[in-house]
């Protein structure tokens, strides 16, 4: 299982901790240190669409108007912190966030 997020993200840390506690092998990928390539980003955008960008974040609000009007891939490439997180890959399945439905899906296995 791979978690895409930020080392400093409290929700990412919580997800990683809970998954490891359940005995699930987790690889954490900090998207600032190792940005998503174009193919990975395109796959996530196909799966999650505009939900992949956290428009409530301070980082999003700090984007200039041109970037705010751009597509999600341009926004995330320019400022990876605007990506909603965590994104979790479990085999062929992708999950966004760490809400109850994601936890049930991943922790019930």
Predicted regions, residues:
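Local sequence-structure signature of Cys/Sec-based thiol-disulfide redox active-site neighborhoods
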Residues: 1-22, 26-32
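Thiol/selenol-based redox catalytic cores and closely related redox-interacting motifs
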Residues: 31-109
């Amino acid at each position: 299982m791979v978690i895409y997020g930020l080392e400093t993200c409290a929700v990412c840390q919580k997800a990683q901790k809970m998954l490891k506690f359940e005995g699930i092998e987790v690889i954490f990928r900090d998207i600032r240190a190792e940005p998503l390539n174009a193919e990975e980003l395109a796959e996530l955008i196909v799966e999650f669409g505009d939900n992949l960008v956290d428009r409530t974040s301070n980082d999003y609000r700090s984007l200039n108007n041109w970037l705010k009007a751009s597509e999600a891939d341009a926004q995330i490439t320019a400022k990876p912190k605007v990506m909603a997180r965590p994104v979790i890959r479990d085999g062929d399945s992708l999950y966004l966030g760490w809400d109850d439905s994601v936890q049930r899906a991943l922790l019930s296995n």
